[in-house]
């Protein structure tokens, strides 16, 4: 889901250096740590798409588990002062009532979620065993500008704008908590600076909505017919509901989400409308191959 175009504008900043590399490559990562001697590591690097993890879990294990292990070893060796692991609410699994707290048991359902849960456990182990100063954030479903078009919201926006079918898994009643990307970034920044070492922090948007509601809302904003909705066979192991308790991050750091779903989704739609070139580039190559292969199995050949 990475895209170099997302980094435009950073090239001229003196403290910015881009290196294209695989975090699971210990030799390459060792060279980077040796050269730059980072004081802190914030690990956003991950394979993140659940559908891809079901089709091909190996890259998820390689990046999300082995890669994190490489970063932890090097952080320990080079005396990194703070290691922040970016994780996901999916490590908790599904919850029908109530909300997950940071001390809730991990019960991942998909290979993606399992790889992130494994990484979280590894990160915590380096704190307990070696005293590495770590933090973990677990965010709910992100959305907003620059999101790769394989994810639900940009997929719906893109297909609807082009009058193509919009796939909805199962009955569409799966609930997700939608977090605008700028809210997430603000929370991560605050956790990095003010979070307590060794702690986990949930980050949510307090916008719990069914997938079907989200799809219908986007279609309404785009003045498109709901006839574009096509219900497809449910995803294996599809979690029914995610919900995060934000009590800890409110009490300890004073953060709360600020962007409502209506405001955030309108901003997102407008961004995709204005950035057709970015979309075209993002949809080329591997994305297009995956898209055709995966959705053709669901009977959506026109996509």
Language model segments and positions:
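N-terminal Rossmann-like NAD(P)+-binding domain of SDR-like oxidoreductases, especially those catalyzing
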Residues: 1-142, 211, 267-277, 281-303
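Amphipathic coiled-coil/heptad-repeat helices and related helical stalk/stem segments
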Residues: 3, 25, 152-153, 184
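Generic recognition of short, well-ordered alpha-helical segments
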Residues: 5, 31, 52-55, 147, ...
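C-terminal substrate-binding subdomain of Rossmann-fold SDR/epimerase-dehydratase oxidoreductases
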Residues: 21, 154, 160-303
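Short, well-ordered alpha-helices that flank and scaffold nucleotide-derived cofactor binding pockets
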Residues: 34, 73-77, 124-128, 158, ...
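Short, conserved catalytic or interaction motifs in soluble domains
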Residues: 38, 145, 205
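Proline-centered turn/helix-capping motifs that create local helix->coil transitions or kinks
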Residues: 84, 96, 131, 147, ...
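The catalytic Tyr-centered alpha-helix of NAD(P)H-dependent dehydrogenases
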Residues: 97, 108-115, 145, 149-153, ...
């Amino acid at each position: 889901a990475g895209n170099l175009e997302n980094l435009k504008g950073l090239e001229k900043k003196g403290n910015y250096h881009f290196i294209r590399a695989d975090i699971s490559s210990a030799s390459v990562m060792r060279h980077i740590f040796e050269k730059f001697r980072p004081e802190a590591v914030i690990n956003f690097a991950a394979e993140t798409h659940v559908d891809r993890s079901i089709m091909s879990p190996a890259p998820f294990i390689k990046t999300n588990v082995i890669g994190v292990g490489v970063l932890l070893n090097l952080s320990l060796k080079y005396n990194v002062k703070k290691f922040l692991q970016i994780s996901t609410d999916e490590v908790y699994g599904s919850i029908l009532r109530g909300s997950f707290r940071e001390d809730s048991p991990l019960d991942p359902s998909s290979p993606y979620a399992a790889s992130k849960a494994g990484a979280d456990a590894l990160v915590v182990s380096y704190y307990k065993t070696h005293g590495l100063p770590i933090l973990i954030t677990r965010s709910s479903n992100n959305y907003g500008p620059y999101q790769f078009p394989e994810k639900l919201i940009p997929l719906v926006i893109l297909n609807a704008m082009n009058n193509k079918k919009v796939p909805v898994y199962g009955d569409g009643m799966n609930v997700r908590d939608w977090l605008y990307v700028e809210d997430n970034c603000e929370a991560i920044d605050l956790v990095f600076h003010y979070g307590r070492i060794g702690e986990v922090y949930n980050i949510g948007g307090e916008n719990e909505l069914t997938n079907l509601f989200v799809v219908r809302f986007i279609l309404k904003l785009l003045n498109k017919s709901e006839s574009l909705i096509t219900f497809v066979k449910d995803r294996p192991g599809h979690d029914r509901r995610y919900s995060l308790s934000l009590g800890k991050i409110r009490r300890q750091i004073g953060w709360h989400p600020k962007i409502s779903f209506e405001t955030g989704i309108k901003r997102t739609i407008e961004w995709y409308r204005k950035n057709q070139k970015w979309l075209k580039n993002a949809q080329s190559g591997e994305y297009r191959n995956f898209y055709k292969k995966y959705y053709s199995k669901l009977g959506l050949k026109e996509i």
